[in-house]
Curated annotation (Swiss-Prot):
Domain PE positions: 4-94
Gene Ontology terms: cellular component: extracellular region
Biotechnology: Exhibits vaccine potential. Immunogenicity is demonstrated in BALB/c mice. Interaction with TLR2 induces activation of human dendritic cells (DCs). Immunization with this protein induces a significant number of CD8+ T cells and a strong Th1-type response, with high gamma interferon (IFN-gamma) and low interleukin-4 responses, and activation of the bactericidal activity of macrophages. Identified T-cell epitopes may contribute to immunity against tuberculosis if included in a vaccine.
Major location category of this protein: secreted
Keyword Secreted on entry: yes
Entry keyword annotation includes Transferase: no
Record key words, sorted: Cell wall, Secreted, Virulence
Encoding gene (name): PE_PGRS62
Protein name as it appears in the record: PE-PGRS family protein PE_PGRS62
Organism phylogeny: Bacteria, Bacillati, Actinomycetota, Actinomycetes, Mycobacteriales
Pfam families reported in the protein's UniProt record: PE
Length: 504
């Protein structure tokens, strides 16, 4: 989806207009060269000579500044012309890969900022205002959903209490008549209550949770230790790229190094495959492997504890409230991933929906702003370095001036994409593909980035016969990704409201 439309003809026309303006300015400057640098002394006295020299120096400085402005103007016009040509070439080339587009866009923005120092600050203000407006619009359409659902639930509980009281008043004589029998039944039920059994069950469940915690912590520590050599090697590669000036690649490898340490792979054993004609349907529930997956497993223990004690309660309003509390814990700690894909091999048409639990989306949002800001700093550093190597010192100064704005814009409004490959075995006989490859292009978003879908590249690695049209990049439906602000203000409260909403 394209959010910006650029007309190369308009850019070229603007460059022509600026060139004409530049010619006029140069003519005016040349005409003023004599009068501003060749002032004659009014008299032969010392004061007149000093005044004449003073104005002469100012005239020379005026000519120097005029020459600098002319050089800046020429460079700006040249940049506009190059930009128009670049847009024409880009449109005719029909785009590229998503990360390449983002990286190229960042470089283009930095190059434009080098030609017009300070422009990045205006872009920062515009992007921030747009995202804040989007954030407020989404919130105002559904303000405080979790709080409103809590209030709605209390109203339901009071209605149930009122109905129970009305029933008791209406049937009061019968209740009084049956009171001795009810008391006797309650006493018998209390005497028959097997407290030892439930105590044993509670102790066993707590031991099980403790064992799960200890085992998971051990697995996480083991995974970190095992992945440390690879982390060191990848960090060394990133450092070498930093030394040679490939700053964006260094940042990308830094992100991959940390990702590979925390996520060592996916358990794709939970897969359901279906075929109908030339259409293949795949439902996969991959599980994260590695320290991050172990951390998510530990996070689910409180929700399991709450569900266990909720199940011990008899049907009542108190149990409903306990179940709602359990649902909140489950929503906040559920790390599940579910991918549903459908592909028609004959037409190469298909859909892909991926649903992520709140912990995973929250993890990406937490890391998103620092990583996007770091990537913006790397882009500015490359722009400065390239300008210096080309002898474009004015461009280098402009990029240096705009670097803080780019860094803050990345922290607030930008996104940096890292690829996450998932290989799902199909178990299908030949000549059908044995594996479906799903490479998710997951974004690290700035704090204010509004919800947006992600994309993925679908391929069939190891297929006996190449499948026309693959690999292909598709838009992924399902859980959107976003920055921390819309996640905390809108998305998570909406998910919690759904978690405690009574079933229809």
């Amino acid at each position: 989806m394209s959010f910006v439309v650029t007309v190369p003809e308009a850019v070229a026309a603007a460059a022509g207009d600026l060139a004409a303006i530049g010619s006029t300015l140069r003519e005016a400057t040349a005409a003023a060269a004599g009068p501003t640098t060749g002032l004659a002394a009014a008299a032969a006295d010392d004061v007149s000579i000093a005044v004449s020299q003073l104005f002469g120096r100012y005239g020379q400085e005026f000519q120097t500044v005029s020459n600098q402005l002319a050089a800046f103007h020429t460079e700006f016009v040249r940049t506009l012309n190059r930009g128009a040509a670049a847009y024409l070439n880009t449109e005719s080339a029909n785009g590229g890969q998503l990360f390449g587009q983002i990286e190229a866009g960042q470089r283009a923005v930095s190059a434009a900022a080098a030609a017009a120092p300070g422009g990045a600050y205006g872009q920062l203000v515009a992007n921030t205002a747009t995202n804040l407006e989007s954030l407020y619009g989404a919130w105002s359409a559904n303000p405080f959903p979790f709080l409103r659902q809590i209030i709605a639930n209390q109203q339901v509980y009071w209605q149930q209490i009122a109905a129970a009281l009305a029933n008791a008043v209406q049937n009061f004589p019968a209740l009084v008549a049956n009171l001795p029998a009810a008391i006797d039944a309650a006493v018998q039920q209390f005497l028959a209550f097997n407290a030892a059994y439930y105590i044993q069950q509670i102790i066993s469940s707590q031991i099980g949770f403790a064992q799960l915690f200890a085992t998971t912590v051990g697995q996480g520590v083991t995974s970190v230790i095992a992945g440390w050599p690879n982390l060191a090697a990848e960090l060394q590669l990133a450092f070498q790229q930093l030394l040679v000036g490939d700053y964006n690649a260094a940042v990308a490898n830094l992100g991959k190094a940390m990702t590979n340490l925390l996520v060592t792979g996916f358990d794709t054993s939970d897969v359901t495959i279906g075929t109908m004609g030339t259409t293949i349907s795949v439902t996969a529930k991959p599980k994260l492997l590695g320290p991050l997956g172990d951390l998510f497993t530990i996070m689910t223990i409180p929700a399991q504890e709450a569900q266990y004690f909720t199940n011990l309660m008899p049907p009542s309003i108190l149990r409903d409230m306990s179940q709602n509390f359990t649902n909140v814990l489950t929503t906040l700690s559920n790390p599940n991933i579910q991918a549903v894909a459908s592909f028609d091999i004959a037409t190469t048409a298909g859909t892909l929906s991926t649903f992520f639990g709140v912990p995973l989306v929250l993890t990406y949002a937490t890391l998103g702003a620092p990583f996007a800001s770091l990537n913006a700093i790397a882009t500015s550093a490359e722009t400065i370095e390239q300008a210096l190597l080309a002898g474009n010192y004015l461009g280098a100064v402009g990029a240096l001036i705009d670097a803080p704005a780019h860094a803050l814009d990345g922290f607030l409004n930008s996104a940096t994409v890292l690829d996450t490959p998932i290989l799902v075995p199909t178990g299908l006989p030949s000549p059908l593909p044995p594996t479906v490859g799903i490479t998710l292009h997951l974004p690290f978003d700035g704090i204010l980035v509004p919800p947006h879908p992600v994309t993925a590249t679908i391929s069939f690695p190891g297929a006996p016969v190449p499948i026309p049209g693959f690999p292909t990049t598709v838009t992924v439906f399902g859980t959107p990704f976003m920055g921390m602000a819309p996640l905390l203000i809108n998305y998570i409260p909406q998910q919690l409201a759904l978690a405690i909403k009574p079933a229809a």
